[in-house]
């Protein structure tokens, strides 16, 4: 990484070391490119980031010959989903019937998943990862992005492409470099953990459980030793919730999910709770000459369905499929960038449409108090619970998403 003008620092400079950026770095390096990933933090450790690795992502790992090593890392598995509606449980999803090497959701802390990708990518000679490398600007020459500037003043030049995979706070968003369409989100989420004990808590079952009771909406994810819990509330009301006090917050959770037990030791104050400000938006153009946005930088997703990581990985695969071969052949990439957006925009719009419908017609009205939870569960929940075959439909959408990618990008020498 030299400022000298005697050549590019990498063929592809990737801004952001999240799932999209790390997977893109691995795939471009696998194809023989010099791929430089820039991550602004000193490590990958962030609590309450997406921890769900879905079957579509594990299919890709299987294609790469990495699935066995991935599953050797500590994780737990989710293969069923249910909703508890005013105290009655309805089964709504069953992943065990998916025809895939890993018919379950692997729950793994995101920092472990990223460390795994880093270790596997390091087997390719063209891969480099720079931590504490904060990008503050883009280098543009003759109307084309040719690299980035770092907070310490260094200039890093990309020989072929700059990929923005720097999340919903992306430089291209903050500086208005690509057009953004907001879809609105009427909810925010508080995350917290409840340790599992022998005396209390839902019975283990490798399940994702939603709870709807009165105005309370909870999601509980089985993490074996604890429950990862999400409490949904009206957008922008975090301070109002805090002002009511932690005792009132605990009481609402305990009423909705009494099997979690007494939460006074688990939630002594709001320091034990993390806020997720929910966004739902997308760029209407993901590229400009020399630059491509993928992952959350291109589309911020709601936590509904827990599919953000997997969409980001699918974007990285689509980018490598469309661009890695031409990059290796020395072809200009600018005329090809539209292919990535064309491939990935429809899945983005379909999934965001489903999330927006969930926001506008279920989560938002209940969380805001505009609508009380009906005493009887919706007919669709009752139907899924009665007909086991139907439970495969939501499982398929959650497990595979829409238009999942198959890896076609070339592989050069290297790797394990």
Predicted features along the sequence, with ranges:
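Glycine-rich FAD pyrophosphate-binding loop
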Residues: 29-49
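Conserved FAD-binding catalytic core of PHBH/FMO-like flavoproteins
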Residues: 143-155, 160-278, 282, 287
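N-terminal Rossmann-fold NAD(P) dinucleotide-binding loop
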Residues: 21-22
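C-terminal helical "tail/cap" subdomain of flavin- and related membrane-associated enzymes
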Residues: 4-5, 321-416
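Conserved N-terminal glycine-rich FAD pyrophosphate-binding loop of Rossmann-like flavoproteins
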Residues: 42-62
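Beta1/beta-strand and adjacent pyrophosphate-binding region of the FAD-binding site
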Residues: 6-18
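Short FAD-binding loop at a beta-strand-to-alpha-helix junction that anchors the flavin cofactor
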Residues: 287-303
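Conserved N-terminal helical subregion
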Residues: 2-9, 59, 63-175, 183-193, ...
């Amino acid at each position: 990484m030299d400022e000298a003008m005697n050549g590019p620092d990498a063929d592809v400079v990737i801004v952001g070391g999240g799932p999209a950026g790390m997977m893109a770095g691995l795939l471009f390096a696998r194809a023989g490119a010099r791929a430089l990933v820039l991550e602004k933090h000193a490590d990958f450790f962030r609590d309450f980031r997406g921890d769900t690795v879905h079957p579509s992502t594990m299919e890709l790992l299987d294609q790469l010959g990495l699935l066995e090593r991935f599953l050797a890392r500590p994780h737990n598995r989710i293969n069923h989903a249910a909703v508890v509606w005013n105290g009655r449980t309805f089964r709504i999803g069953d992943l065990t019937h998916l025809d895939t090497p890993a018919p379950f959701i692997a729950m793994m802390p995101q920092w472990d998943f990223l460390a795994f990708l880093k270790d596997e990518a390091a087997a390719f000679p063209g891969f480099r990862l720079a931590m504490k490398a904060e990008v503050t600007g883009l280098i543009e020459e003759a109307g084309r992005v040719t690299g980035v500037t770092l907070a310490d003043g260094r200039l890093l030049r990309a020989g072929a492409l700059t990929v923005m995979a720097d999340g919903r706070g992306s430089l291209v968003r903050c500086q208005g470099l690509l057009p953004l369409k907001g879809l609105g989100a009427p909810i925010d989420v508080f995350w917290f953990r409840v340790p599992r004990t022998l005396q209390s808590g839902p019975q283990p079952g490798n399940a994702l459980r939603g709870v709807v009771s009165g105005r309370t909406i909870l999601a509980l994810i089985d993490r074996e030793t604890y429950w990862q819990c999400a409490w949904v509330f009206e957008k922008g009301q975090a301070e109002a919730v805090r002002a009511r006090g932690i005792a009132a917050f605990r009481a609402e959770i305990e009423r909705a999910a009494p099997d979690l037990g007494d939460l006074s030791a688990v939630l002594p104050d709001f320091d034990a709770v993390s806020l997720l400000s929910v966004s739902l938006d997308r760029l209407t153009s993901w590229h400009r000459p020399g630059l491509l946005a993928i992952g959350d930088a291109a589309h911020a997703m709601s936590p509904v369905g827990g599919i953000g990581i997997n969409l980001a990985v699918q974007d990285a695969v689509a980018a490598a499929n469309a661009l890695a071969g031409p990059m290796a052949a020395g072809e200009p990439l600018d005329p090809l960038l539209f292919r990535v957006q064309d491939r990935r925009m429809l899945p983005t719009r379909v999934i965001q449409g489903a999330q927006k419908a969930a926001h506008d017609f279920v989560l938002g009205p209940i969380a805001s108090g505009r609508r009380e939870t009906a005493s009887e569960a919706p007919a669709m929940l009752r139907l899924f619970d009665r007909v086991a075959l139907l439970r495969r439909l939501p499982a398929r959408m959650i497990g595979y998403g829409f238009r999942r990618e198959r890896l076609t990008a070339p592989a050069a020498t290297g790797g394990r």
